[in-house]
Amino acid sequence: MFNIISKKYTQALVDSGSNLDETLSILKGLSLALKDKRNADIIASPFLSKTQKEQFLLESVGKVDMKLQNFFRLLAQSDRILLIPYISDELERRLLARKKEYAATLTAKESLDTKTLEKIQDSLAKKLGVKLSIKQRLSEVDGIKLSVEDLGIEVSFSKERFSNDLKHHILKAL
């Protein structure tokens, strides 16, 4: 739900003609600030008026151009300040897509060393003909999964599934 709404706000930012790289850095800073429980509680507080939340937000970003100020005012008046991390992520995806750069997520049970990550990154980037950066995420699942969400690519290998398929194939052969 938040992703759908954030895409509309992101499109408004893209259409506004503002410096998108600068806007992205401001949004990332706000996203980090909103991860702090105290700041998120202030924004979500029913005891503060929308005007007070707007002032808090505008003071947090400092001096920005008028279009961006109006954007933040709109977010505050619409009670959408907590969408800023989603807007930031969507804007980052769009900017990377313009540059033919994509972010991939590698999910594994154990952390892989940087050399292995670079090999995977280089070979996949070469195959797809794009720039690629891999972020690693740890999981409890015994296997490995690589996904490039923006390109609709997902490759996974599960130890349990492999084992089950092997057993099934052996039983079928007998």
Swiss-Prot record:
GO cellular component term, pick one: plasma membrane
A Pfam family hit: OSCP
Transmembrane segments: none
GO molecular function: proton-transporting ATP synthase activity, rotational mechanism
Record's subcellular location: Cell inner membrane
Highest taxon of source: Bacteria
Coiled-coil intervals: none
Disulphide-bonded residues: none
Keyword vocabulary terms for this entry: ATP synthesis, Cell inner membrane, Cell membrane, CF(1), Hydrogen ion transport, Ion transport, Membrane, Transport
UniProt keyword Cell inner membrane, yes or no: yes
The family this protein is said to belong to: Belongs to the ATPase delta chain family.
Complex and partners: F-type ATPases have 2 components, F(1) - the catalytic core - and F(0) - the membrane proton channel. F(1) has five subunits: alpha(3), beta(3), gamma(1), delta(1), epsilon(1). F(0) has three main subunits: a(1), b(2) and c(10-14). The alpha and beta chains form an alternating ring which encloses part of the gamma chain. F(1) is attached to F(0) by a central stalk formed by the gamma and epsilon chains, while a peripheral stalk is formed by the delta and b chains.
Free-text function comment from the UniProt entry: F(1)F(0) ATP synthase produces ATP from ADP in the presence of a proton or sodium gradient. F-type ATPases consist of two structural domains, F(1) containing the extramembraneous catalytic core and F(0) containing the membrane proton channel, linked together by a central stalk and a peripheral stalk. During catalysis, ATP synthesis in the catalytic domain of F(1) is coupled via a rotary mechanism of the central stalk subunits to proton translocation. This protein is part of the stalk that links CF(0) to CF(1). It either transmits conformational changes from CF(0) to CF(1) or is implicated in proton conduction.
Name listed for the protein in its UniProt record: ATP synthase subunit delta
Organism per entry: Helicobacter hepaticus (strain ATCC 51449 / 3B1)
Lineage: Bacteria, Pseudomonadati, Campylobacterota, Epsilonproteobacteria, Campylobacterales
Gene for this chain: atpH
